[in-house]
């Protein structure tokens, strides 16, 4: 019913108003928000690292249990907060990994230095029974060992293995400038127990009676001529004030319980992030504008209502992201564009049903009511299949792909709400106020209103072509394979920007050769000032990838700024590869189960096979054109899985409906009629979704551009497969009407489309 009681209408408008209030801070500057009353919301959706700039690390905690992982994360968070890096993201991932994101910090090496130092502090007594040189050349005493200093070259000290003091005896550590010589020092504050032990150690009267050791390296070996009965002790060493402050914070926060290894490093400069942000916002706005204009031209006042609902959809989506504290990234923008496509698809389904029922002789009000009612199950099924792919991607994906999956999942919820309640409310108010005598005519036609195309006559041709194409792709995969990006093969990718003039690609190549870095490629970037350096996996462990990153900084930092740094070790690349394959498999399994539950096994199997066809063909595009296959490629494939199922479910839903009504009709005729009845929706939705991705391709970054291109091709392939693969497979699988189905009389239009009457 189009009727809404007052309280239902009030609740819907209240939900929209509350969402607008929650989302409103995102449309104002921070300075404007500061001047608003305190009772108004001021929380904004934060920008992700790819839009704001910053650094991201994936760290592996060795031999970590749950307690060690939590303790390590807390210590890392404390270190970053004390150093002034506000609101860092420090979260556990999996069984033994920690993800760290710090907006505004562009020196990833500094971040690694802060977080990978264990901070094991000890005071160790000197062993004067033999000289360090003799111990190095020979064998040190059983209870002693040689420990080297931070100096260059390092100096060896013969120290007792058992510490006199440890970090547990330290209550505070602060960096300052010495009043004596103006050099940076670290002042340690000891507790009472530590003070007594230090006094006992130095009471022996031996000069150089102890050394201060951090992570098994001597940082200071003070000369002591008498007992030290003090709670404060200064460490002097070869470090500047920043290094001293970093060390003080490390000592103050406590030692990490286990050693930490860097598995993945990603850094993006603020200027590049701002460029990405501007381009992403422009792409999203243009996508919404193009889609909205198309809907208005196609459906008149109903298109205007769809456009208003789309704006409300985006507002509610923004409000939810604000409430849960999510950040907006390039991936989120891509998810937003996909949400726009899903929302428009739902409206097209309803409006095409309305027009179909109006042609059958229904009144405008009856057609509106019937359109919403009959499109409901199709909309829900189509969106839930996409939701399955999004949830799998969220659970198995990593990094920015999480943002895409989260945005799509939330967007599906907001799309269902706005389409099935808010749009319906607006149409009800329009019908009640304007009392229209006719459904608005379509001003823009891509396909005829009614078609009678005999698709099933081509079933063997199309199935044969598709089988042959899939076989060719499989052969190419076996013999050539994907052009894997660093996400799946490991390695480094660095975007350099010349500090003066243009980037000299030849010079960069020569300098890389001098560094003895294997498998390095230098490519031109979007600007003549920039160059892209891609280095393959070193295949000797995660530390080797980090060594390459250090070499690059040391060689090029004076002449080039590092706009972007991505370093992925073999451990992470293997995990991402497994997760990518598993994500596709689980998506197909989940969708098969859902479609089987909602329909029948023939339809479930047909849907999965046609979707698998789309995955294979889309993969073939990556292989043939040697497009880089990375996490974005997996996201594109999973999105197309959802979109393909969306298309297929719409046709299958109509097949199911016609089978129930006309169980005596030949199955090929029913399938032909079902495809023709939904053809305008299929082509309109494909065209609108394709339009939505054009701005994303035009203005997105390189990865987003590849993603948009893959989706655009995937949309075409998915539309083809839903008509020429999924539908004919139902005949091959012997689909029949259920015995309990009751047939209705065949009206003239359906009889003509079913070819049951001449």
From Swiss-Prot:
InterPro entries on file: SecD, SecD/SecF_arch_bac, SecD/SecF_bac, SecD/SecF_CS, SecD_1st, SecD_SecF_C, SecD_SecF_C_bact, SecDF_P1_head
Annotated membrane topology: Multi-pass membrane protein
Transmembrane segments: 9-29, 277-297, 301-321, 324-344, 372-394, 404-426, 460-480, 579-599, 605-625, 631-651, 682-702, 706-726
Gene Ontology annotations of biological process type: intracellular protein transmembrane transport; protein targeting; protein transport by the Sec complex
Domain of life: Bacteria
Family label: In the N-terminal section; belongs to the SecD/SecF family. SecD subfamily.
Assembly information from the UniProt record: Part of the essential Sec protein translocation apparatus which comprises SecA, SecYEG and auxiliary proteins SecDF-YajC and YidC.
Protein name, entry field: Protein translocase subunit SecDF
Organism for this UniProt entry: Brucella abortus (strain 2308)
GN (gene name): secDF
């Amino acid at each position: 019913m189009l009727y809404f009681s007052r309280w239902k209408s009030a609740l819907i408008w209240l939900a929209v108003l509350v969402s607008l209030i929650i989302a409103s801070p995102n449309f104002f500057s921070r300075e404007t928000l500061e001047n608003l009353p305190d009772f108004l919301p001021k929380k904004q959706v934060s920008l992700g690292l790819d839009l704001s700039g910053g650094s991201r690390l994936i760290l592996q905690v060795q031999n970590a249990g749950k307690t060690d992982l939590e303790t390590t994360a807390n210590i890392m968070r404390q270190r970053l907060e004390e150093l002034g890096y506000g609101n860092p993201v420090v979260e556990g991932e999996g069984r033994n990994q920690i993800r760290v994101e710090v907006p505004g910090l562009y020196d990833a090496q500094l971040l690694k230095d802060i977080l990978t130092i264990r901070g094991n502090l000890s005071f160790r007594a000197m062993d004067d029974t033999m000289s360090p040189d003799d111990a190095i050349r020979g064998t040190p005493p059983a209870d002693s060992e040689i420990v080297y200093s931070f100096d260059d070259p390092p100096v060896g000290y013969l120290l007792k293995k058992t510490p006199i003091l440890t970090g547990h005896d330290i209550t505070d550590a602060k960096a300052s400038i010495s009043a004596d010589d103006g050099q940076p020092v670290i002042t340690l504050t000891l507790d009472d127990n530590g003070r007594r032990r230090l006094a006992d150690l130095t009471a022996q009267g031996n000069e150089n009676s102890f050394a201060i050791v951090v992570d098994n390296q001597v940082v200071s070996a003070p000369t002591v001529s008498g007992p030290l009965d003090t709670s404060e002790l200064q460490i002097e060493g070869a470090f500047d004030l920043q290094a001293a402050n970093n060390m003080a914070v490390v000592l103050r926060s406590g030692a990490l319980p286990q050693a930490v290894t860097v598995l993945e490093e990603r850094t993006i400069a603020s200027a590049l992030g701002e460029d990405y942000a501007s381009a992403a916002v422009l792409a999203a706005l243009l996508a919404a504008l193009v889609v909205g204009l198309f809907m208005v031209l196609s459906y008149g006042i109903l298109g205007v209502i769809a456009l208003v609902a789309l704006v409300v959809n985006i507002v509610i989506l923004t409000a939810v992201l604000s409430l849960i504290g999510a950040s907006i990234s390039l991936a989120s923008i891509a998810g937003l564009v996909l949400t726009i496509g899903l929302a428009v698809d739902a409206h097209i389904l309803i409006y095409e049903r309305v027009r179909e029922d109006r042609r059958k002789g229904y009144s405008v009000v009856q057609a509106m009511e019937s359109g919403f009612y009959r499109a409901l199950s199709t909309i829900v099924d189509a969106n839930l299949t996409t939701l399955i792919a999004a949830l799998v991607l969220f659970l198995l994906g990593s990094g920015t792909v999480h943002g895409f999956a989260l945005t799509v999942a939330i967007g599906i919820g907001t799309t269902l709400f706005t389409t099935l309640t808010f749009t319906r409310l607006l149409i009800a108010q329009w019908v009640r106020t304007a009392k229209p005598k006719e459904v608005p005519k379509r001003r823009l036609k891509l396909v005829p209103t009614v078609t009678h195309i005999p698709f099933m006559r081509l079933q063997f041709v199309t199935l044969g072509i598709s089988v042959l194409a899939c076989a060719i792709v499989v052969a190419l995969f076996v013999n050539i394979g994907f052009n894997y990006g660093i996400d799946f093969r490991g390695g480094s990718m660095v975007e350099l920007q010349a500090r003066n003039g243009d980037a000299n690609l030849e010079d960069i190549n020569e300098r890389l050769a001098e560094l003895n870095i294997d498998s390095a490629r230098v490519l031109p970037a979007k600007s003549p000032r920039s160059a892209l350096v891609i280095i393959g996996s070193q295949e000797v462990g995660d530390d080797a990838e980090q060594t390459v990153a250090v070499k690059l900084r040391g060689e090029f930092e004076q002449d080039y700024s590092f706009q972007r740094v991505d370093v992925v070790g073999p451990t992470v690349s293997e995990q991402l590869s497994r997760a990518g394959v598993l994500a596709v498999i689980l998506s197909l399994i989940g969708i098969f189960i859902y479609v089987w539950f909602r329909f029948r096994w023939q339809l479930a199997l047909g849907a999965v096979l046609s979707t698998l066809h789309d995955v294979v063909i889309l993969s073939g595009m990556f292989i043939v054109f040697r497009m880089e296959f990375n996490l974005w490629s997996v996201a594109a494939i999973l999105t197309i899985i959802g979109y393909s199922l969306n298309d297929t479910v719409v046709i299958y839903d109509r097949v199911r409906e016609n089978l129930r009504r006309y169980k005596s009709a030949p199955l090929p005729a029913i399938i032909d009629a079902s495809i023709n009845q939904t053809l305008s929706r299929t082509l309109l939705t494909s065209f609108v979704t394709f339009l939505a991705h054009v701005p994303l391709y035009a203005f997105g970054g390189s990865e987003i551009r590849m993603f948009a291109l893959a989706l655009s091709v995937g949309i075409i392939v998915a539309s083809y497969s839903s008509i020429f693969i999924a539908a004919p497979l139902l005949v091959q699988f012997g689909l029949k009407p259920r015995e309990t189905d009751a047939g209705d009389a065949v009206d003239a239009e359906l009889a003509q489309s079913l070819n049951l009457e001449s």
